[in-house]
């Protein structure tokens, strides 16, 4: 008896040791964030330093970056976007779905319990008078559990969690994109308002010039061509104003769609526009890895793909499941269901191992590895594209700031030239063709200056978006610096 017990103990210990050894071989590779080529500083940062207004380092920490522009109307519209924008609503639903999938994967780690019951009353039709109907009741309580010996379920949970975090980042990206589009369309609309005001003033000036040429023609001291040229300038300016009304309506319709209402139910009255260009804290390139939602989402996709390798590898090992049940069946009275004499119980263990699959599992593992490498490449490209976007907007910010000073100077000179030539025309010193040329140049310079000012604002918006808009991946707080990814040969 002792020998049998000793033999059984040795067998049990060997089985446990083998299971532990196999469990150590199972599971996916340890995840390490892929390395990226992040420079210490931005290439165009020095070029932009003299042209970007200073801002405190925590200016964007709340994520309400649009408030940096100091426009109360924009602030109100941004609030409506966050509540009613349908792209954001879809991203919220996707995130909620991803969280539910995490809960579903995590539930597989625990046993499931089921309760079954049935009752039946039966008898014969047209039978003898001695036969009577009979009752039959059954009830059972069952439990089943698949222990996660090889880590497949844990890897599935890890993959689902990473996908949920990627979905969270996608939600942040949707908010950033929607409010960025709102701000861009809003300031473009305000720029159209400013151009309309400018054209109204220009039309008044052209009307006065037309009256002057008409009076001179009536007095016989000017040619009819002068009147026709003045009329052409006046009518063209009016046509330009009509075109700006169409442009403004287009921006207004875009804003309506962004805040989730039909264009027919939304209008934005004209208002004075202040071309404020806010300060944008730059930080260093490495912080972009945590502050840009698209980068964070791409990195989480890498983590999810890494977990898929573990799931694929777990198929090499046997599936183990445990079952237990207790219950009674075919009793005539309900109270007898709980009688010990009628109770049956059972315990079960099942093990299933694939013996031959013609390389299907190996193919799935190779597919998972390739999927991982693909996600790493997409992540690195996302990082590079993000760095490019920041550098582009830094260059644009510096260039446009320098251009504004020059354009302002050019506009002032063109205005002065227009006025001087008009005075000389009144004195009969120049032809009206010279006045027309000066008027066209002055109007072009004024409109170019206004357009450049809104370009500076939209460039600031693009730079804020490129920097992540103040968002930060919460799951990366305190994370270690990125380490080189494991080579494909060792995964």
Stretches with model-predicted labels:
Residues 53-54, 60-68, 74, 118-142, ...:
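Small/polar, glycine/serine/threonine/aspartate-rich low-complexity segments that form flexible
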Residues 217-221, 425-429, 466, 470:
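A short glycine-centered flexible hinge/capping loop motif at secondary-structure junctions
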Residues 2-14:
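Bacterial N-terminal signal peptides that target proteins for export
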